[in-house]
Amino acid sequence: METNDKKISVNKGNEAELNIIREIAESGDDCPVLMLNLNKYHDEAGFPNGSPYRDYINVLEDLLPRVGGRIVWRSASLGRAVGEQDIDEILAAWYPSHQAFLDLPGQPGAKENFRLRKICVKSAVIHRCNGVLP
């Protein structure tokens, strides 16, 4: 994820989905959203105990509350029963609204977060899910 004039763009991203997120944010019917991140890390990140990975998670944990968000949970992937996607970690980030997700790149600390993300994350798929938590 990279920032550009406080807009979110995703490498190899789904611009149609980002447009939906923007439409929801502007609709007056914005609602909480859970972003489920399926992450594959570079070997150099040292997942799960390496310094680059820990720095990335620490900065992310400091950044999300700036927009009212938080990491709900994260877990190492132990394997896959179905499919071919090779990932290291599943991370669930909750946002109070779609607008909060869009506001993240403009927050203090975002530039450092995206710098560390680029160092650590080899590939990611981020699914937008219902943000109503049990």
Which stretches of residues belong to each language-model region?
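Short, Lys/Arg-rich amphipathic alpha-helical interaction segments
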Residues: 92-95, 99-134
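Short S/T/G/P-rich N-terminal loop/turn motif that feeds into the first structured element of a domain
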Residues: 1-88, 96-103, 130-134
